[in-house]
């Protein structure tokens, strides 16, 4: 069962990396130029600060998951003897997995809110609707947000597996004692 959980976690991490890289590429390569009244106007992800933040967050999350994938493949070939050190590493992985899930989900929500304002506009602040002029730009941002939320769900499952791997090391009868 141990090996199958590791394989499932590796497969989910690989899928997460693909979705995060796809999100970052869709955001980073998105721009559209239109001629409006003989003036060229360009819409880019750099115009929306939440998208710039999401680009950085998804890139760092993909790098973190790649690092964890490499570490887990290395640890699968090397079995440590100290159960105590493995517990510390399991705690570290659990906390980092939780932090990355929350960061990516929060970044996606911030970008979604900013994109919603771009979609609908806001008369009180004199913000114009962009999506009636830059349709391809808005469609591509919508696709990147969808990929980002799928990556968040995948990372939630990784965090659940990480929690399972952590708490199965402890005794069910003695509070916070490792199994021997």
UniProtKB/Swiss-Prot annotation:
Gene Ontology CC annotations of this record: plasma membrane
Positions on the Extracellular side per record topology: 29-49, 120-140
Entry keyword annotation includes Aminoacyl-tRNA synthetase: no
Subcellular localization(s) per the UniProt record: Cell membrane
Cystine pairings recorded for this chain: none
Record membrane topology: Multi-pass membrane protein
Ranges of the Cytoplasmic topological domain: 1-7, 71-98, 162-180
Pfam families, alphabetized: CASP_dom (PF04535)
InterPro entries attached to this UniProt entry: CASP/CASPL (IPR006459), CASP_dom (IPR006702)
Transmembrane segments: 8-28, 50-70, 99-119, 141-161
Keywords: Cell membrane, Membrane, Transmembrane, Transmembrane helix
Assembly and oligomerization: Homodimer and heterodimers.
PANTHER family found in the cross-reference section: CASP-LIKE PROTEIN 2C1-RELATED, CASP-LIKE PROTEIN 4A4
Family statement: Belongs to the Casparian strip membrane proteins (CASP) family.
Name used for this protein in its record: CASP-like protein XL3
Lineage: Eukaryota, Viridiplantae, Streptophyta, Embryophyta, Tracheophyta
């Amino acid at each position: 069962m141990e090996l199958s959980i590791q394989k499932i976690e590796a497969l989910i991490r690989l899928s997460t990396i693909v979705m995060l890289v796809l999100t970052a590429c869709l955001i980073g390569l998105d721009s559209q130029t239109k001629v409006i009244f003989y003036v060229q106007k360009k819409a880019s992800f750099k115009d929306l600060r939440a998208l710039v933040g999401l680009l950085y967050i998804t890139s760092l999350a993909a790098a973190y998951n790649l690092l964890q994938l490499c570490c887990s493949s290395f640890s699968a070939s090397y079995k440590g003897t100290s159960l105590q050190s493995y517990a510390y590493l399991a705690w570290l992985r659990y906390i980092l997995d939780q932090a990355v899930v929350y960061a990516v989900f929060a970044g996606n929500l911030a970008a979604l809110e900013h994109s919603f304002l771009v979609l609908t506009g806001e008369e009180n602040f004199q913000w114009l609707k962009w999506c009636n002029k830059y349709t391809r730009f808005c469609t591509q941002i919508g696709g990147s947000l969808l990929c980002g939320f799928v990556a968040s769900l995948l990372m939630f499952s990784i965090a659940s597996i990480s929690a399972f791997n952590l708490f199965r090391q402890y005794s069910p009868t003695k509070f916070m004692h490792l199994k021997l």
